[in-house]
């Protein structure tokens, strides 16, 4: 590589390209530039600048490759994490759907139970109302009967008072007292 570079430089510095006078002269600007360039290239080669440049380029390429590998590893890890989160999200969604379905079932059962309880309460209240009505009817009948008995007794007492004599009244009172005594004993 070094020889090829030197050969190209030497061919490029052909005396035919010189502008004036002999080519190998310090007065010829092209010759001076050629010599300076060759010295510069020689110094670069002496201090191993091309190998240092190649080493730096290789090092940079390795750094870029390492960065790319790290980026690929991070991308793979991110994809794994994303897949994990998506799986967890599906599981959570499934659990949420199950919870909602269970809540709907529970609400339906609670509504049915409330309807049954309401029907039972209405039936109890109707039964209680019917019992109160029957009791009120019985009380009214008793009151009517009692009043009828009172009226009948009063009417009978008046009829008897008008038709009975004092001795008959006294005999009836004695008979009633005797009957009460026998019943009490």
UniProtKB/Swiss-Prot annotation:
Q: Which Pfam families match?
A: ATP-synt_B
| Record carries keyword Lipid biosynthesis | no
Keyword Cell inner membrane recorded: no
Kindly list the places in or outside the cell where this protein is found, as annotated in its UniProt entry.
Cellular chromatophore membrane
An example Gene Ontology CC term for this record: proton-transporting ATP synthase complex
UniProt entry keywords in alphabetical sequence: ATP synthesis, CF(0), Hydrogen ion transport, Ion transport, Membrane, Transmembrane, Transmembrane helix, Transport
Q: Name one GO molecular function term.
A: proton-transporting ATP synthase activity, rotational mechanism
Q: Which residues form the propeptide?
A: 1-19
Q: Tell me where the transmembrane regions lie.
A: 29-49
State the NCBIfam families in the record. Answer: PRK13455.1 (NF009989)
Quaternary structure (record): F-type ATPases have 2 components, F(1) - the catalytic core - and F(0) - the membrane proton channel. F(1) has five subunits: alpha(3), beta(3), gamma(1), delta(1), epsilon(1). F(0) has four main subunits: a(1), b(1), b'(1) and c(10-14). The alpha and beta chains form an alternating ring which encloses part of the gamma chain. F(1) is attached to F(0) by a central stalk formed by the gamma and epsilon chains, while a peripheral stalk is formed by the delta, b and b' chains.
Family, per entry: Belongs to the ATPase B chain family.
What protein is this chain from? ATP synthase subunit b
